[in-house]
């Protein structure tokens, strides 16, 4: 019985000491190096384009182009609303309610 056990153990040791093949993870390093190199090259190209101002004329042409007059059809003409004083009115504070409190507080705390 002892002889049979030794052959099984020696077979297990030989199977675990073999080097892994290319299919089990040997190709992971070249892929990782390729991705890192691609990212570095892309960032260098973007930095060079920014430093050399390659896109400046395209950016300037968008900045200095006048707006088209076709898009302004939904705006009301200037001077149409006479009540527009520049303040946003919500109905949380009623108009005129603050004026009465200020006059009453002045009479109460007059010096």
Swiss-Prot record:
Ranges in the topological domain labelled Extracellular: 1-27
Positions annotated with a glycan in the UniProt record: 5
Keyword Glycoprotein found: yes
Biased composition (Acidic residues): 79-88
Highest taxon above the source species: Eukaryota
Annotated region (Disordered), positions in chain: 64-111
Keywords, comma-separated and alphabetical: Cell membrane, Endosome, Glycoprotein, Membrane, Signal-anchor, Transmembrane, Transmembrane helix
Signal peptide: none
An example Gene Ontology CC term for this record: recycling endosome
Pfam families in UniProt: LRR19-TM
Membrane topology field: Single-pass type III membrane protein
Cell compartment(s), UniProt: Membrane; Early endosome; Recycling endosome; Cell membrane
Expression by tissue: Expressed in stomach, kidney, large and small intestine and kidney.
UniProt keyword annotation of Cell membrane present: yes
Residue ranges that the UniProt entry lists as topological domain Cytoplasmic: 49-111
Residue ranges of the TM segments: 28-48
Function as written in the Swiss-Prot or TrEMBL entry: May be involved in membrane trafficking between endosomes and plasma membrane.
PANTHER family xref list: LEUCINE-RICH REPEAT-CONTAINING PROTEIN 19 LRRC19 FAMILY MEMBER (PTHR31450), TYPE III ENDOSOME MEMBRANE PROTEIN TEMP (PTHR31450:SF3)
Protein name per UniProt: Type III endosome membrane protein TEMP
Source organism: Mus musculus
């Amino acid at each position: 019985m002892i002889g049979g056990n030794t052959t099984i153990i020696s077979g297990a040791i030989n199977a675990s000491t073999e080097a892994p093949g290319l299919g089990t993870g040997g190709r992971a390093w070249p892929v990782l190096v390729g991705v890192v190199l691609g990212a570095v090259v892309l960032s260098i190209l973007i930095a060079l384009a920014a430093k050399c101002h390659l896109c400046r004329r395209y950016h300037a042409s968008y900045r200095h182009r006048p707006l088209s007059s076709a898009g302004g059809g939904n705006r009301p003409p200037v001077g149409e609303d006479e009540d527009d004083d520049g303040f946003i009115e919500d109905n949380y504070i009623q108009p005129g309610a603050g004026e009465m409190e200020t006059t009453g507080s002045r009479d109460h705390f007059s010096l």
